[in-house]
Design a protein with these regions (language model features):
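Phosphodiester-processing cores and adjacent nucleic acid-binding clamps
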Residues: 1-156
Length: 156
């Protein structure tokens, strides 16, 4: 039985620029997608667009070779409900750690920990969101968000 090729465009993929989560250079992803009948591909690396120049150069090369393929530029960003609440929780966990160190537990079997307030998992709780540029203005907006995210508290 021969399988019919369906039109498919992957809108979320990681290259080697997503440390610990992706592999292969953008051009390898593009060649693979094109070789499997796709006419476009979005690479959405974690928190950066470091592969964009590779995408752009390879797309030009593919076009020169007569291949109909469109790179889609994007990023996988992280979303938290409230940066202020996150900062408060981080500060509270830090204070709880300091207080726990100050309490002398050598004469008892007491464990000093408030499991509800000292849950580090709450600090790493975040949602992923894929941002794709529809046009030049969208690309500029993504650049701006990424740039701002690398300043201050590493959030935007």
């Amino acid at each position: 039985m021969e399988l019919k090729k369906e039109q498919f465009v992957n809108l979320h993929g990681h290259s080697c620029f997503s440390l610990f989560d992706g592999f292969g250079f953008p051009q390898e992803h593009m060649d693979f997608a094109h070789g499997n009948g796709s006419k476009a591909l979005a690479l959405t690396d974690h928190g950066s667009m470091n592969g964009l120049s590779y995408q752009l150069l390879h797309a030009k090369q593919m076009k020169a070779e007569g291949k109909d393929f469109k790179p889609i530029f994007g990023v996988e960003a992280y979303y938290i409900d409230s940066l202020d609440e996150w900062k408060e929780l981080k500060e509270q966990i830090s204070l709880d750690k300091k207080r726990a160190k100050e309490i002398d537990t050598s004469d008892s079997a007491m464990v000093v920990e408030d499991e509800q307030r000292n849950d580090k998992r709450a600090l790493s709780r975040k949602r992923h969101i894929v941002l794709l540029a529809q046009n030049q203005k969208g690309l500029e907006n993504i650049y701006e968000m990424i740039s701002k995210s690398y300043g201050g508290d590493y959030f935007y």
